[in-house]
Amino acid sequence: MRQILLIVAAMLLTCCSSESDMNAQTNTNMGKTLIVYYSYTGNCREIVNSLAAQVTADQLEIQPAEKGLKYEANGYALGTQLLNAIKANPDDAASYPAIDPVSVSLADYQNIIIVTPLWWSQMAAIMQTYLFQSRDQMAGKTVALIVSSHSSGISGVVADAQRLLPSVTWAGDALWVNASNHSNRASLISTWLPTLNFQTTATAISHVNADRQQHRAYTLSGTLAQAGRKGIVIVDGKKYVR
């Protein structure tokens, strides 16, 4: 992954007394990454295992509320029924199949990697449910997509992801893992990861408690800036370049 270097030196504030009592509270996600996946046949779980060996990330598995369903039975009748219901009313929560409750807070993460199977040229309905329910929490996140299919192209899944997550920043092109290259997935992932434009540090100081008088400078990650460091400094709402 590309390292995003913060060259902005950040805030100067006026503080009181010789020993200023300043407490910079920074964003806590600090570029943390979450892998969100749904796996019906087990292929996506294998992809996640290979991915987890190469990137530091937490994992969240999405599960359907109703267990044991055979989505592929009778010519994929049930899977097609679920997808058609979503296509008919994509903005209606009732159109999406129920999933198990999720306790993970997306506020703890800046980067999200979605790993999903393809169902008849579309994103699996179970993953669509999670993204529909989480679209507001994902706003402003940096997101990457891995799609597993047998042989079908993934443009329909990419379109579903873009529809469901209109307010995210896409880190790069989606990775397609199919039946012919699944055994080579680790190599595919290692080639793909460096192409992603993921955020790896915090981007802001969320809150500063300060008394007035003495000046101190803090970086955007919340650490005390070194004396003489070049960058953009804000003093009493005015921007200075030093």
What are these model-predicted stretches?
Residues 169-201:
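Glycine-rich phosphate/pyrophosphate-binding loop and the adjoining helix
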Residues 40-43, 64-68, 118-122, 149-153, ...:
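Solvent-exposed loop/turn segments at secondary-structure junctions
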Residues 23-114, 123, 190, 194:
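N-terminal beta1-alpha1-beta2 submodule of the flavodoxin-like/Rossmannoid cofactor-binding fold
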Residues 18, 199-223:
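Residue-level detector of functionally pivotal "anchor" positions at catalytic/ligand-binding pockets or at interdomain
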Residues 1-26:
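Bacterial Sec-dependent N-terminal signal peptides
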Residues 232-242:
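C-terminal tail/sorting-segment detector
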Residues 77-167:
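Helix-loop-strand module that forms the ligand-binding subsite of alpha/beta enzymes
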